[in-house]
A protein has these predicted regions:
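Gly/Ser-rich, acidic/histidine-flanked active-site/gating loops
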Residues: 1-30, 35, 107
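Glycine-rich phosphate/pyrophosphate-binding loop
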Residues: 42-69
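Short alpha-helical scaffolding segments that buttress acidic/His motifs in well-ordered protein cores
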Residues: 20-21, 67-75
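Short, surface-exposed loop/helix-turn segments at secondary-structure junctions
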Residues: 46-50, 85, 89, 93, ...
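Structural helix-boundary/capping segments
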Residues: 1, 5, 35, 40, ...
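Short, hinge-like loop/turn segments at secondary-structure boundaries
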Residues: 23-28, 129-131, 169-170
Length: 197
């Protein structure tokens, strides 16, 4: 109806994207946030009498549990003896995932996937298991690590909760992604439906 030819494809390497992301992103965060020592960057401690006390009292100040968890994970991945096994290998797999997407865009102008494997959380709900929370990113992470443009639009409702639909384009294909998503929204009414709160 919208002038698109639709067919299925498979990107098997994207199965590794979540692991790749949760090695690369925490490693980069760890490297960037290591400067927050409370002296030049970060929250300083006015009550410390030594630099060691200042560092100890301010090192984690201002960071939530999830940020601290990711900094520790990244520091581990970048540490001696683990850099090649984790960070370097993750970067290599990232390159393969990017290439797989690039190859798919030789055949397709855009890809369409769910935004998340689950419906939206109910207000106030959350998952206390960090791994399960990370799994909610399984559809969007591959696109991010490949450096591609994407947009999520309302794609329907399941059990009264909204479901997202993700449009993905080739590198620098932002206009294609926006046009495809806009055409979908003009043809559907999901973006005008609001769940009862």
């Amino acid at each position: 109806n919208l002038g698109a030819n639709v067919s299925e494809t498979s990107l098997p390497l994207t199965d590794h994207a979540l692991a790749v992301y949760y090695i690369i992103a925490p490693s980069e965060a760890s490297a960037n946030l290591s400067r927050y020592d409370g002296v030049k960057y970060g929250l300083g401690s006015l009550n410390a009498s030594t630099s060691a006390q200042a560092t100890e009292s301010t090192r984690g100040a201002g960071f939530g549990d999830e940020v601290k968890r990711r900094i520790l994970l990244g520091t581990y991945a970048l540490s001696a003896g683990y850099y090649d096994a984790f960070y370097k290998k993750a970067q290599q797999v990232r390159t393969l995932i990017r290439r797989e997407f690039t190859d798919s865009f030789l055949k397709f102008d855009a890809l369409v996937t769910p935004t998340s494997p689950n419906v939206a959380f109910k207000i106030g709900d959350k998952i206390n298991d960090p791994f399960q929370m990370y799994m909610n990113d399984v559809c969007t992470i591959p696109v991010n690590i490949a450096g591609l443009p994407s947009i999520s639009v309302p794609g329907g409702v399941s059990d009264g909760l909204p479901v997202g639909l993700q449009f993905i384009g080739p590198q620098f294909g932002d206009t294609t992604v926006i046009r495809a998503a806009a055409a979908y929204q003009r043809a559907t009414n999901w973006h005008n439906n609001h769940p009862l709160i």
